[in-house]
């Protein structure tokens, strides 16, 4: 029998894990950026680096659900623009891991995202197209930020939400593109987490297996919410969740 005591030391730890699983399921099927709200709780409960190893397989499982449901909705031109620099972001995260505290980078990322979010909201308020979206550096920058933040703390939800909101694509394309991007990114991360950071093992996988039903519940709720919200309502809701997520990155 697998001993969970090295990771699960109280009932609170199970509650945090299951809440994370519900939020991850919802974020992968419609409620973008919601999963990051559980990142601080996971880090405080399990430790910063162990928590990323616990969360990643849950994310991968939820990605498969999201892609299976929205598989024909993706805008691949955006994914192709993002992926190369996202992989570069992995290596940047590995390089700075032992040099600079992750919290300092998280706050820096939060500040950058807050600035970009402000520009995007200003453009929408003025009724103009995002003035940055066609810049040659825009997609590579978000790819790098996404790869770095997802490697450091599975915290790339707000990065992608801001990027995809700035494209003004329809909600189904938004969710499908997000699902495919993170499916690619999270499965590419697995070897790094297993062999470089050694924070995924049989015990963590067994713990994650207990969270599977809660991922399914969250996925169902996310799908229902996307169907319920009109296009404008979806953008407003996603923007609000993203603002909260950026504040979490800045303040926690």
Region locations from a protein language model:
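Membrane-interface helix termini and inter-helical loops of multi-pass transporters
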Residues: 1-7, 94-104, 193-206
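Transmembrane helix exit motif
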Residues: 2, 64-73, 108-134, 224, ...
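Residues within membrane-spanning alpha-helices of integral membrane proteins
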Residues: 14, 56, 110-113, 117, ...
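Small-residue-rich hydrophobic segments that form or flank transmembrane alpha-helices
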Residues: 14-80, 142-143, 147, 157-215
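Small-residue-mediated transmembrane helix hinge/kink sites in multi-pass secondary transporters
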Residues: 40, 94, 98, 162, ...
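Cytoplasmic-side transmembrane-helix entry/capping segments in multi-pass membrane proteins
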Residues: 75-86, 108-112, 133-141, 173-180, ...
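Hydrophobic alpha-helical transmembrane segments in multi-pass integral membrane proteins
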Residues: 92, 96-97, 147-155, 189-193, ...
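Interfacial loop-to-transmembrane junctions
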Residues: 220-241
């Amino acid at each position: 029998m697998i001993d969970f005591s090295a990771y699960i030391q109280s009932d609170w730890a199970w509650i945090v894990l299951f809440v994370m699983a519900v939020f991850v399921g919802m974020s992968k099927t419609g409620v973008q950026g919601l999963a990051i709200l559980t990142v601080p709780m996971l880090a405080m409960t399990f430790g910063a680096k162990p928590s990323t190893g616990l969360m990643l397989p849950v994310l991968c499982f939820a990605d498969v659900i999201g892609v299976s449901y929205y598989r024909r909705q993706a805008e691949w031109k955006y994914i192709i623009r993002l992926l190369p620099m996202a992989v570069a972001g992995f290596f940047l995260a590995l390089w700075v891991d032992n040099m600079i505290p992750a919290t300092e980078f998280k706050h820096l990322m939060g500040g950058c995202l807050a600035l970009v979010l402000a520009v995007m909201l200003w453009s929408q308020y003025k009724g103009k197209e995002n003035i940055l979206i066609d810049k040659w550096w825009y997609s590579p920058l978000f790819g790098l930020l996404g790869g770095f933040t997802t490697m450091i703390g599975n915290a790339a939800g707000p990065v992608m939400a801001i990027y995809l909101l700035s494209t003004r694509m329809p909600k189904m394309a938004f969710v499908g593109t997000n699902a495919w991007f993170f499916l690619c990114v999270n499965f590419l991360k697995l070897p790094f987490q297993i062999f470089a950071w050694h924070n995924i093992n049989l015990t963590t996988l067994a713990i994650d297996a207990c969270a599977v039903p809660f991922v399914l519940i969250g996925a169902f709720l996310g799908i229902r919410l996307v169907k319920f919200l009109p296009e404008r309502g979806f953008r407003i809701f996603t923007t609000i969740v993203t603002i909260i997520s950026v504040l979490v990155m800045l303040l926690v």
